[in-house]
Every structure is written in C-alpha cells, then in structure tokens.
From Swiss-Prot:
Keywords: Amino-acid biosynthesis, Aromatic amino acid biosynthesis, NADP, Oxidoreductase. NADP(+) binds at E83, G126, A127, G128, G129, A130, L204, G227. Its EC number is 1.1.1.25. The lineage of its organism: Archaea, Thermoproteota, Thermoprotei, Sulfolobales, Sulfolobaceae. This is Shikimate dehydrogenase (NADP(+)). Belongs to the shikimate dehydrogenase family. It comes from Sulfolobus acidocaldarius (strain ATCC 33909 / DSM 639 / JCM 8929 / NBRC 15157 / NCIMB 11770). GO terms for molecular function: shikimate 3-dehydrogenase (NADP+) activity.
Length: 263
C-alpha cells in the first residue's frame, strides 16, 4: 500500500485520451519494488490546456513521460534534449528539465538483441513520434530506411527533418522487400499481408500483445518484437534515467500478466 508523505516525489505520464495507458501500473510497481518513495499519475490533458499544465508539471514533478500527441510539442519547454531526441524531434522522458527518447533506446536495443546479422533494408509504417524513433533506431543500426504513411505531407516533413541531420530516408507507397518491417501506427492491420516478409517484424501496438501482425509473423516463421516488449523496455530505460536503476523486463511483464492488465 502506497503511503504518501511530504517526501513523496511526483512522476507521471502526460498525453491526451490515454485512459488505456499502462505506465502508472508499471512505474508504481517499479517504485514499490525498488524502494522509491514516489507516486506515478496519469495526466490526461486537452490540447487547449497543454501549455498551462506542462509548465505546472515541470515545476512540481521529479520526472515525466510524454505520450501522444505531445512528444514533439514538449521539446520547446525544456532546457536541453539528448542527441537522439534532438534528431528524432520527439521526447518521451523528462528529467531535470532535460528530454530523452527511450522509445528509440528500447527499439534499437531490442532489434540488436533479436538479430544476428546486420539489417540492410527496413520499412517503417507511420511517420509520427513512434515512427521517428523507429526510423532513427534503424538508421543507427545501419539500415536503408523506407517509410510508408497515409499522409504524404507528414512523411515528406519527416524526410526533410532527418535530411537536416545528414540522414537519407525514402518515402514509398508500397512495400519494399527487406529485412525488417516496423508498424509504428496505432493499427497493426495497416501493414498489408504481402509486406510481412524478411527477418524481423516489429509492432508497437501492445494491447493485445499478440496483434494480427505479430500472429501472422509467427505463422510464417518470422521473428517478432511485440509492443509490450517495447513498452516495458522504454519504461525501464526511463527508470534508469531517473534513478540509475530498474527492474528486469521479465519481472514487469510477469506482473502485468498476473494483474490481467494485458492479454
């Protein structure tokens, strides 16, 4: 049972329309297991209230996570951002008024752990904050990156942003045969069946864990990384930024299943 007192530190996740978020469950469990006197709350904030709320939270919170749709908006309120957050143009973790992108760290490390051979051609579906983090991870792994997005204008804006940092990505309208497919959209069905090929499929959707995309990858014998793996890894990366320590991914996943918070 959490006991709140004058020394209890405040953490939380800031987004809009996020009643589904598992972040409070994950981090409050981690605080308890790590012996940290802190509480983690959900801040579901409308766009017209964002400015006043973020200023208030940055003054009173010891650390924050940021999710849809504010990962890019929050950057201008910070003193500084890490190299990966600067290139990606999106922040999902804040500590001491500095911004980080643990989505990128999680995706990069999980792909590196899953693949033996260096990937060459990779396709990302989605050009939002998660798409940007995925693209940067693939670029740092040595991939030639192709992007498919419903909004051509947004995809071209992303292409321009990465080019400013010396990275070339290509916008395409249909799948290109390659090593890795990443779904960075909220809908795993956005990836056509004919695209599910290669060495690895990554789906950032985490509930259900076994999305249609992950199930199809497993059926065809392709290795996969599901959204829950990414969610938990990025959360533990945030814990390491805040406290210099974290739980194992396996323990957190086991906790979420035991509490029936994922299926």
């Amino acid at each position: 049972m959490l006991k709140i007192n004058n020394d209890t530190k405040l953490f939380g996740v800031l987004g809009e329309n996020i009643p589904y978020t598992l972040s409070p469950a994950i981090h409050n469990y981690a605080f308890q297991r790590l012996g940290i006197n802190a509480v983690y709350l959900r801040f579901d904030v409308r766009r017209d209230k964002f400015h006043s709320i973020i200023i208030g939270l940055l003054n009173i919170a010891s650390g924050l996570n940021v999710t849809i749709p504010y990962k890019e908006d929050v950057v201008k309120y910070l003193y500084g951002v890490s190299e990966e957050a600067r290139v990606i143009g999106a922040v999902n973790t804040i500590h001491n008024l500095n911004g980080y992108n643990t989505d990128y760290i999680a995706i990069y490390n999980l792909i590196k752990e899953k693949l033996i051979d260096k990937p060459s051609i990779c396709t990302v579906f989605g050009a939002g904050g998660a798409g940007r983090a995925s693209i940067y991870a693939l670029l740092k792994l040595g991939c030639e990156v192709y992007v498919i997005n419903r909004s051509l204008e947004r995809a071209q804006s992303l292409e321009k942003d990465f080019k400013e940092f010396g990275y070339d990505i290509k916008i395409i309208s249909s799948c290109k045969p390659g090593d890795i497919i990443v779904n960075a959209t909220p809908n795993s069905s956005y990836v056509p069946d004919e695209c599910i090929k290669g060495k690895l499929v990554v789906d950032l959707v985490y509930n259900p864990v076994k999305t249609p995309l992950i199930l199809k990858a497993e059926k065809t014998g392709i290795r996969s990384i599901n959204g829950l793996e990414i969610l938990v890894r990025q959360a533990m990366e945030a814990e390491r930024i805040w406290f210099g320590k974290s739980l194992s991914d396996e323990e957190v996943v086991k906790f979420l299943y035991a509490r029936k918070l994922v299926r």
